[in-house]
Amino acid sequence: LAERVVPADDNAPAVCHLDTGVFRVHVLLRDSLAESDHHSIIGTSGNDAHPRGHGTSMAGLALYGDLDEHLQSTEIVQLHHRLESVRMTPGRGEVMIDRIDYGSATVQATALTEISSPRRRVFCLTLSTKPDKPGEPTLWSAAVDALAIGTDSVRVGDQFRLISVPDPVSARLFVVAAGNVDWYAQDHRVQSDSSVVEDPAQSWNSLTVSAFTELTRSPQDPQYSGWEPMSKVG
């Protein structure tokens, strides 16, 4: 597959991942994520700090979508956008970002990419935390809201302040993950209805996205023998 991939031009629009970092030298990512677009606000390495490669997986999904179609084909895969990455979570031995500073960290990560390259981009924020008061604004969600409408902001203690008026020229599209469901139930519909989005997905000016699948057939791998899908499509 890697031999059939044609990366987008250097100045093409990008998906900027604010996540756990990306393993940039991955064979399917390296030509779409330049070293100059591989950042971190913690330490010096932009490589994935997650033990299971969360940021790398999210970057691959944003770049290719479902890989099955490409793997089963022999056609050239022409890409039309590039990747950027800012690592926002610590690796081994690095200091955790205080929860009160998640918003400030997001502002810093956003500025880092915009200073580095003036290209068009969509921000993909796939980090979240359990909310203390589900649905209510937080310092983090307020920072995302301000970034989305092109407003400068600052945290003063536990207060959030806007320091400029909205600027349409500086507006940004933020796609924010709805969060995770950490437990499983047979009645998945009730579980979906009763689960709340995680912070900062309650922000008003971002596009909050959750996950779904159309994979409704049992895998062919023998280890899944006897397994059945939980539900039908729709």
In which residue ranges do the predicted regions lie?
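Generic recognition of flexible, low-complexity loop/linker segments
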Residues: A2-V5, N47, Q72, F160-S164, ...
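Short glycine-rich loop/turn motifs that provide flexible caps or phosphate-binding loops at active sites
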Residues: H54, A178, V233
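Substrate-binding/access-modulating region of protease and related hydrolase catalytic domains
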Residues: M88-S203, L215-T216
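Subtilisin-like serine protease catalytic core
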Residues: E3-D37, S45-D101, P118-V122, P134-G135, ...
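Extracellular S/T/G-rich loop segment that most often corresponds to the catalytic His/Ser-adjacent loop
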Residues: D19-R30, S195-G234
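Short helix/strand-bridging catalytic loops that position acidic/His residues to coordinate divalent metals
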Residues: E35-D48, D187-V196
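Low-complexity, flexible helical/coil segments
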Residues: A49-S57, G157-I163, A211-E214
